[in-house]
Amino acid sequence: RWYYHCDKLGIIVWQDMVNGGGAYPMWYVTYLTNALQPLMRRAPDGKLLWGFLGRGSVHSREEYARELADTVAALGRHPCIGCWVPFNEGWGQFDARKATETLRALDPSRPVDEASGWFDRGGGDVHSIHNYFYPLRIRPNVRTVVLSEYGGIAWPMPGHEPPRKTYGYGTARSRAELTERYCDLQRKTVLPQLKKGLSALVYTQLTDVEDEVNGLFTYDRTAIKPDAAAVRAVNEALEVEFEKAVKE
């Protein structure tokens, strides 16, 4: 039903495959990979790395192949599906090029974001960047360059906090500070990169969730956290600049 509503509303879905495999050592998959990028992300794509990413067993890799095919069969008829994403941030990632080849054989009509985040192998149609901590530098690429995760500024709005921990990528102390930091991020970090080939943005994130309070809306979906007019204005400025970049 969710995909049906996306079809009706015109919401484009970038569809991840279900995470799987064994346990992920977070010290490697998340912390070390972030701290030592891009060095760690250039690790050879072989069985040693697959083991660190939870895909050490043949059975697990075969199960992924079945689930990938089943996912395309189940969802491929929905017009809302705009892009397939075999792997996100290394979770259960292995042989990414082969996954892309399989997806293109199953559905040649849609682009593939081969590895959203960490372990980019140069394949697929999208160079997919997750960046929360480092200067953003977009370089020319034969693939579409997408900032597919960024931002994540936390602010637990009083009276609307989720029931669990309140995680984010940096914390604001008030609505005013959240608004200021969001607008500065868009104007000073993102906007200058549009002329360099940055083609799409995915802000983290639309709403607060159980473990994170970095949404633009509260966990209960009843309030917008930053100043709506300021957010709209800076987003419209990005849109204008993007249109200029396309025409150039």
Where are these regions (language model features)?
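Substrate-binding/catalytic cleft of secreted carbohydrate-active enzymes
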Residues: R1-T222, P226-A229, N235, E241-K244
